[in-house]
């Protein structure tokens, strides 16, 4: 454990004593050889003015779309391994229907009924929390019976009825910032979800349109959104997309994914979203911007240790 980590441990434990248990630090364990990794910290009492000293890291990972049993199980098994290795709680993510594919001929997914069966199986067989997105209000109720987090796609983040339906399920709602909105603009989707009864609302940065077939990330959006929501996620994979740049499909530059994560951390993000695949080049959706599953461990380790 380095000096900064030891100092943080001391500060959190001291604050826990000072506020009679209002701050709670988790343990520090030796996960691999002689390298010690800091576990996440979280404050119980958010009224404590020092709660920003510590950070709750949220990790979300999974294939862009549900493809087949082999891919699903390979990804889920790796997430279980990484959870044990790092003492974290990665949420399994995958879509049952990619309703916003560029081309009509592109693979969309297994559909609502079959997709929810797969996600329920991931929860049961692997013990992972799961997240999926919805595109229509009527999907919220059945999805809410299975998943832990309901995601609102970026293109749909201003759709009031969709947000309200997701919020009414009682599940955590993750709202992705549209490619045409600023961080400050996310105040309004957030307020819609809270007003509809959502107890926990996350906001996700995923870049902004920059001319044709390109996205750029204005990292100032992260602190802007942190002033709105406690938990702000960086979508490290969709932010490297090149929309429509691959002839009827989305292109991307996956080599920038690790840098996106570290830059987001520097700007105060406390969550990280990765679409991953055992063989992204053979993925049925968003292959060029998915992270190779074998590379996820190194990316997470870098986030936790730097």
Locations of the language-model features?
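Conserved N-terminal beta1-alpha1 strand-loop-helix module at the mouth
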Residues: 51-118, 124
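Hydrophobic faces of well-ordered beta-strands that scaffold small-molecule active sites
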Residues: 59-61, 90-94, 130-132, 150-152, ...
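Active-site-adjacent loop and "lid" segments of alpha/beta metabolic enzymes
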Residues: 104-113, 151-156, 212-216, 239-265, ...
